Design a protein with these regions (language model features):
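Extracytosolic ligand-binding ectodomains
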Residues: 1-372
Length: 372
């Protein structure tokens, strides 16, 4: 299997046998959302460098072994097998939920610890496992918060266009159930290909006050936004993108002002503390642009795993109590893990969730609209 390997080591240390290795999974090429993967990897690499500058893991340097998953579940599962053969102490990363699910299932089967950085799909594994934990809020929590935001803003009839995917289907179901419980309605619109323009006709016919985009970026998301913005019948219609597409610089570059005022979920606290501010500045320098919440997730993932490896030891099997004992200070707060009722993986239950958008007056600035 092809992939890239990134080694982050302290200056003057080059004894490869002494390294503690973490396998890092990220979408770095298309059809994966490679912009998200680049931010995720930047956060992980920065954290590894800081861990090594502070002495590593019991004096041993930490090293990332990176594999590009390219939004391919089969490729991710193969990467987990390969990384296990290479002797990594744990796995980290992944952005795409369906890909993370494949990686988590394989890690569980192999007994390899995996801390998922960014994927939110609730059912990361089919069975209860001690091996897998997750940093971001589960989809059922985040998307309910998004539905609550829509209801609080006065939206009761909401349209959605969705591409075929377990992730999008799960998200639509969460939204529909939450809205229905509060007298709201979610109406599914067809998504014609290759021209999404007929979405505007269907939206006008449904008399919905909002349209949610459960679709990929750049296309068809960019074309749909442009079509809706230019249709006079739809003036005042809210466009929403709960999966976070407007977070990244490519969204603003493609849509400029048309991409503003589109609420999305963002997994950051309302204000970063001193650690978050310092890491944010370092990430901005590393990325040559504002870091997304995904970059902070990458940093925090390695920070948590480094703490686990220091306290629990390298090469010792995890027990059901290992994740429960974690208490790691990260850029977005202190991470502690527990199991939600019915959950199969360990979860940071208090992970921050916001609904934000880009300010129409200044699209490079984000406005916090709602917190959960």
């Amino acid at each position: 299997m092809s992939g890239m390997v990134t080694q982050v080591r302290p200056r003057g240390r080059d004894d490869s046998d002494a390294h503690v290795r973490i396998g890092a999974l990220a979408p770095l090429t298309r059809p994966g959302w490679h912009e998200a993967g680049r931010h995720l990897l930047a956060g992980m690499e920065l954290a590894v460098r800081e861990v090594n500058d502070a002495g590593g893991i019991a004096g041993r340097p930490l090293e990332l072994v990176v594999r590009d998953t390219a939004a391919d579940p089969g490729r991710a599962a193969a990467a987990v097998d390969e990384l296990a053969r290479l002797g990594v102490a744990a796995l980290a990363g992944e952005y795409h939920s369906v890909v993370a699910r494949a990686a988590a299932s394989r890690a569980d089967a192999l007994g390899l610890p995996f801390l998922c950085s960014s994927a939110v799909l609730d059912a990361l594994t089919e069975r209860r496992t001690p091996w897998v934990a997750r940093l971001p809020a589960a989809q059922s929590r985040g998307w309910r918060i998004y539905a609550d935001f829509l209801l609080a803003a006065g939206h009761r009839r909401i349209a959605v266009v969705a591409q075929p995917s377990l992730y999008w289907t799960s998200g639509a179901r969460i939204l529909r159930d939450r809205l229905a419980a509060r007298d709201g309605t979610l109406v599914a619109l067809d998504l014609p290909e290759p021209d999404p323009a007929p979405v505007c006709d269907a939206l006008a016919e449904q008399d919905a006050s909002a349209l949610l985009l459960l679709v990929g970026i750049p296309e068809p998301a960019v074309s749909i936004v442009r079509s809706v913005r230019r249709d006079r019948r739809l003036a005042g219609t809210l466009i929403g993108a709960p999966a976070g597409q407007p977070e990244f610089a490519s969204w603003a570059a493609a849509l400029a002002g048309d991409g503003a005022a589109i609420p999305f979920l963002r997994y950051l606290p309302e204000r970063l503390g001193p650690l978050g501010a310092r890491v944010g500045a370092a990430l901005r320098e590393r990325l040559a642009e504002a870091p997304s919440f995904v970059a902070f997730e990458g940093y925090d993932t390695v920070a948590v795993l480094a703490g686990v490896l220091r306290s629990h030891g390298v090469g010792r099997p995890l027990t059901a109590e290992t994740w429960a004992q974690v208490s790691a200070e990260g850029t977005r707060g202190r991470s502690r893990f527990s199991r939600a009722p019915g959950a199969t993986v360990w979860q940071w239950l208090d992970a921050p969730v916001q609904v934000v958008d880009r300010d129409p007056a200044e699209p490079g600035r984000f406005r916090v609209l709602h917190t959960g």
